[in-house]
UniProtKB/Swiss-Prot annotation:
Pfam families in the record: Ig_3, V-set
Stored Gene3D superfamilies: Immunoglobulins (2.60.40.10)
Protein name according to UniProt: IgLON family member 5
SUPFAM superfamilies from the UniProt entry: Immunoglobulin
Location relative to the cell: Secreted
Organism: Mus musculus (Mouse)
Keywords of the record: Disulfide bond, Glycoprotein, Immunoglobulin domain, Repeat, Secreted, Signal
Record GO cellular component, one term: extracellular region
Cysteine disulfide partners in this protein: C54-C112, C154-C195, C238-C291
Recorded family membership: Belongs to the immunoglobulin superfamily. IgLON family.
Extent of the signal sequence: 1-30
SMART domains linked to this entry: IG, IGc2
Sugar-bearing residue positions: N41, N49, N67, N137, N288
InterPro entries with a match to the protein in the record: Ig-like_dom (IPR007110), Ig-like_dom_sf (IPR036179), Ig-like_fold (IPR013783), Ig_sub (IPR003599), Ig_sub2 (IPR003598), Ig_V-set (IPR013106), IgLON_domain (IPR050876)
Amino acid sequence: MPPPAPGARLRLLAAAALAGLAVISRGLLSQSLEFSSPADNYTVCEGDNATLSCFIDEHVTRVAWLNRSNILYAGNDRWTSDPRVRLLINTPEEFSILITQVGLGDEGLYTCSFQTRHQPYTTQVYLIVHVPARIVNISSPVAVNEGGNVNLLCLAVGRPEPTVTWRQLRDGFTSEGEILEISDIQRGQAGEYECVTHNGVNSAPDSRRVLVTVNYPPTITDVTSARTALGRAALLRCEAMAVPPADFQWYKDDRLLSSGSAEGLKVQTERTRSMLLFANVSARHYGNYTCRAANRLGASSASMRLLRPGSLENSAPRPPGPLTLLSALSWLWWRM
């Protein structure tokens, strides 16, 4: 049988609950028999209101609501000092109290005890307080070098006991439990990880995210050489992936280059790439160039060329086809 909805009235039929005996005399209650049947359960969410109602089908001379052994109300007389507990109804047919803003401390056994003309009766209800799941502690953002280990922690509380799930937002990888262990982490595992907790009390789960940064040395992923005529503009490009981002340097024949009118070139660097710009190519600009990308974990270099149009340097040779013998010999010489 499902528990009543939060704030619902729990109808306790006293005449059908001959499970114990109590005597109220001038506000004093002493229990004289043990209860032979279990109490009904009444479930509410933390922060909701709970109405406890005792419906009576006999003439009653005395009636009281108790929490454990503490009297809350005896008839119209208030015994509790808790301002959240108040009397709702006290008639010959019904005796009801209201508990507002229910908290975990309100959970427990409640007893409606009343005296009829013939004998005393009691009936009981066990108030269960559910608490929505919420995250109380989660790991701070993590930065680790590639190949290292990462432990992410997510602590959640709630009643019933909540479930905790870790999820990597990039690829949807999931792991159950408060602790997520990642061994030998790789750059592809960097990104945001989300902790989600839920216990069914509220429709919306609680979630928080942690950013995991994986540091690794630069890897040059692309370079662009150029063939440009004298007097024209040219561009050499170098792209590199690295965390932290790489610092780029350009060299010509082992000489470090910098932007300036004397060199006739400009270095323009963005986050993952650097470009060497020539506004007006002169003969001294032709030759070999080296791009170097470095961060605190390492460095990587790649070479490229600025060539004169028509130059055979760095051009990919073609295999001999239906050509003259001289052409074939020239091709073989180039391969040697």
